């Protein structure tokens, strides 16, 4: 049986956004989005969902390493975070007076873009 394709949802965060994790073992952690994977609706957040990877030595005489790196989490488990108000909020999309579409935090009304 063939593997099912993941359902694509629109991702509400972009690279460089500050987000707070709202579910999982790192709940409450605030970090910066390093990378977004829109096809699988996943994001890579700095300092969240850390995994240890054992790397074999590549050349003779070189020693192996244990590397700690971030693993991706689903975008539904993060909310945009306001650094000024210190609160996480859902996102609303609105238009400015000049016609640009911008993201706005629902709790504070702060415009992100």
Swiss-Prot record:
GO terms for biological process: translation. Signal peptide: none annotated. PANTHER family: MITOCHONDRIAL RIBOSOMAL PROTEIN L24. Keywords: Ribonucleoprotein, Ribosomal protein, RNA-binding, rRNA-binding. One of two assembly initiator proteins, it binds directly to the 5'-end of the 23S rRNA, where it nucleates assembly of the 50S subunit. One of the proteins that surrounds the polypeptide exit tunnel on the outside of the subunit. GO terms for molecular function: rRNA binding; structural constituent of ribosome. This is Large ribosomal subunit protein uL24.
